[in-house]
């Protein structure tokens, strides 16, 4: 039975017997029940199951009650606690001091009882002890009999819960490297300490020859293979063959060992085998392959591909694209953050984005900044709308989740990206129809294969994400909220064909105005690597909250100050230079799972 990470709800009160405690019991419990209902009705785990909370059986008026509740929570995979109170309580006697939980307190903003006073006292206690805790306090005074949760409080509770559940879902899971370093890309040279210390994850290594072994020995479900291949033939239409008419060098011609008309058969096997490597598949045990049936306990992974694989075998573009999509030949299903070129840091960027949204992460090269002047010079036309200040060309070398087509529709008929459990058959078919599969350019991919080719055809709010590693500092996070752009078709065609017309394209315009985001050029210039991952929605504030839980400082973002939500201890390092305070507190606290 699957054990989900949960949030413990702790109602705390003034413990004085003889009228005080008795007058607070009902209100405190109502607050706790309301918080539990809000979280469980709003948030979902990556598999679509509603998030679960555990409500304490009693209110907490002192250390005796706190100890009983701690015992109740033991063994239930409580990753975080939310303490709620309408009144003064006894500071350190009622606080959650478990070193293994992420903490928040919601203090009721009312006049009859000083919930805000306890909140401040508890935050002072946490700061003295060097324990980060999130402070939740409503903007407006409420009446004592008002049992609603104000909107601003709801937003903070949900941001805290989203981040905490993301932390819990990563803990103990694996990132599976299939292959090793790709083309000298530093992000594909995995840093095991980063995964262990900051994410609580294991790192698994699987040589790419394992795929060939399983193909040769037929270590895969033959029924699943037939289903996948038939689905591909029915739904994955082929696009252009960029190799037609070329006089290719002999070294290219003799490098392709899988005949072109057998590419899809090889690719279908590759896709199901890589999925089996990451996850459990009991069908393999039925076939006698019990060790392989157990999988690698994965939550994310990546495939090296270039060049030791792609120089002679069909590339991994289909596998990479379909793993990260919200569907495959079995219909809608949970996405997997799966990185091209095994860029582990972009794989983590994908993972953070998809855990916060439950939507497909789109892997891209942060390829080119196109200024309005350059576009006018090259195309004779001007950029307009969201694109008017210039655009960044997000384009991957053949593999991006098909949700990036923006062909799915919301209830009002608008193009969007969805969680897998909201994807309809019409949505799936629309994404497939908006994608064609172009034969790989043999000059770059001698072994052939097919690239997912589409363009994002909707103006959607998105957030571009990148985790970087800096020697002496450690991991850092970059965030750019903005919009995908629909540009003039003539402009698109000219710009797209200057790069590679067989690859998936998204035109991105970041929101400008914040420091580091003075111009679109500045964003491109500040970006820390050649790759980025974007997800649907403006989730920069949630990413900042999650990063603070993991103790990863944010070096670039365009989230307005009023949306930033970090533990109260961060304000202890200053309220003017927030970036400096972020670095200082993350350094002081150290990684979440520091040894």
Curated annotation (Swiss-Prot):
Output this protein's name: L-fucose isomerase
What is the first-listed, main subcellular location in coarse terms?
cytoplasm
Q: Which InterPro entries match?
A: Fuc/Ara_isomerase_C, Fuc_iso_dom3_sf, Fuc_isomerase_C, Fucose_iso_dom1_sf, Fucose_iso_N1, Fucose_isomerase, Fucose_isomerase_dom2_sf, Fucose_isomerase_N/cen_sf
Which GO terms fall under biological process for this protein?
Answer: D-arabinose catabolic process; L-fucose catabolic process
Q: Which family does it belong to?
A: Belongs to the L-fucose isomerase family.
- Co-factor requirement: Mn(2+)
Q: Which SUPFAM superfamilies does its entry note?
A: FucI/AraA C-terminal domain-like, FucI/AraA N-terminal and middle domains
Q: What Pfam families does the entry give? A: Fucose_iso_C, Fucose_iso_N1, Fucose_iso_N2
The disulfide bridges present are: none
Catalytic activity annotated for this protein?
Answer: L-fucose = L-fuculose
* Cited NCBIfam families: fucI, PRK10991.1
What would you give as a GO molecular function for this chain, any one? arabinose isomerase activity
Q: Which organism is it from?
A: Clostridium perfringens (strain 13 / Type A)
The protein's superkingdom reads Bacteria
Cite the EC number: 5.3.1.25
Positions annotated to bind Mn(2+): 341, 365, 531
Name the gene that codes for it.
fucI
Which residues does UniProt mark as catalytic?
341, 365
One GO cellular component, as annotated: cytoplasm
> Any idea where this protein resides?
Cytoplasm
Known pathway:
Carbohydrate degradation; L-fucose degradation; L-lactaldehyde and glycerone phosphate from L-fucose: step 1/3
């Amino acid at each position: 039975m699957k054990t989900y990470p949960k949030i413990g709800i702790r109602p705390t009160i003034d413990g004085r017997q003889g009228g005080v405690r008795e007058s607070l019991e009902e209100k405190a419990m109502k607050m706790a029940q309301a918080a539990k209902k809000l979280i469980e009705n709003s948030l979902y785990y990556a598999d679509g199951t509603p998030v679960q909370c555990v409500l304490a059986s009693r209110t907490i008026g002192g250390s005796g009650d706190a100890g009983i509740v701690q015992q109740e929570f033991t063994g239930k995979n409580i990753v975080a606690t939310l303490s709620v109170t309408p009144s003064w309580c006894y500071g350190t006697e009622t606080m959650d001091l478990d070193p293994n939980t992420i903490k928040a307190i919601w203090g009721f903003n009312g006049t009859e009882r000083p919930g805000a006073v306890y909140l401040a006292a508890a935050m002072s206690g946490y700061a003295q002890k060097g324990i980060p805790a999130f402070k939740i306090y409503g903007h407006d005074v409420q009446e004592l009999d008002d049992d609603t949760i104000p909107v601003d409080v709801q937003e903070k509770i949900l941001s805290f819960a989203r981040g905490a559940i993301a932390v819990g879902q990563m803990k103990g899971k694996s990132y599976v490297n299939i292959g090793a370093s790709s083309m000298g890309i530093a992000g594909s040279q995995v840093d095991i300490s980063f995964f262990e210390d900051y994410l609580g994850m294991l790192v698994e290594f699987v040589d790419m020859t394992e795929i060939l072994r399983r193909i040769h020995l037929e270590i895969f479900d033959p029924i699943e293979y037939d289903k996948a291949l038939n689905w591909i033939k029915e739904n994955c239409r082929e696009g252009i063959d960029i190799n037609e008419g070329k006089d290719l060098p002999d070294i290219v011609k003799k490098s392709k060992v899988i005949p072109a008309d057998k590419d899809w058969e090889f690719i279908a096997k590759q896709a199901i085998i890589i999925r089996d490597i990451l996850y459990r598949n009991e069908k393999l045990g039925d076939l006698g392959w019990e060790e392989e049936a157990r999988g690698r306990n994965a939550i994310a992974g990546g495939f090296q591909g270039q060049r030791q694989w792609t120089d002679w075998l069909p590339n991994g573009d289909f596998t990479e694209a379909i793993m990260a999509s919200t569907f495959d030949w079995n219909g809608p299903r949970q996405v997997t953050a799966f990185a091209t070129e095994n860029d582990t840091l972009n794989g983590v960027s994908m993972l953070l984005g998809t855990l916060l949204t439950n939507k497909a992460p789109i892997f891209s090269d942060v390829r080119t900044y196109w200024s309005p002047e350059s576009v006018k010079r090259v195309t004779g036309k001007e950029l307009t709308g969201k694109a008017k200040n210039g655009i960044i060309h997000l384009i991957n070398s053949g593999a991006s989740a098909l949700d990036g087509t923006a062909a799915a529709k919301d209830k009002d008929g608008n193009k969007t990206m969805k969680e897998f459990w909201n994807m309809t058959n019409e949505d799936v078919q629309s994404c497939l129809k908006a994608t064609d599969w172009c034969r790989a350019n043999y000059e770059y991919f001698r072994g052939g294969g097919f690239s997912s080719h589409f363009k994002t055809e909707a103006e959607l709010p998105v957030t571009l994400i990148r985790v970087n590693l800096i020697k002496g500092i450690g991991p850092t996070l970059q965030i750019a909220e903005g919009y995908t752009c629909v540009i003039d078709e003539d402009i698109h065609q000219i710009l797209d064909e200057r790069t590679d017309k067989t690859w998936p394209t998204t035109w991105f315009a970041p929101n400008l105005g914040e420091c580091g985001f003075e111009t679109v050029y500045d964003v491109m210039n500040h970006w820390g690597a050649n790759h980025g991952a974007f997800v649907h929605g403006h989730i920069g504030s949630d990413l900042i909250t999650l990063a603070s839980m993991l103790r990863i400082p944010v070096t670039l973002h365009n989230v307005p100050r009023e949306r930033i939500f970090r533990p109260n201890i961060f304000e202890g390092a200053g309220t003017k230079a927030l970036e400096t305070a972020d670095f200082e507190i993350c350094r002081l606290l150290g990684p979440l799972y520091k040894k």
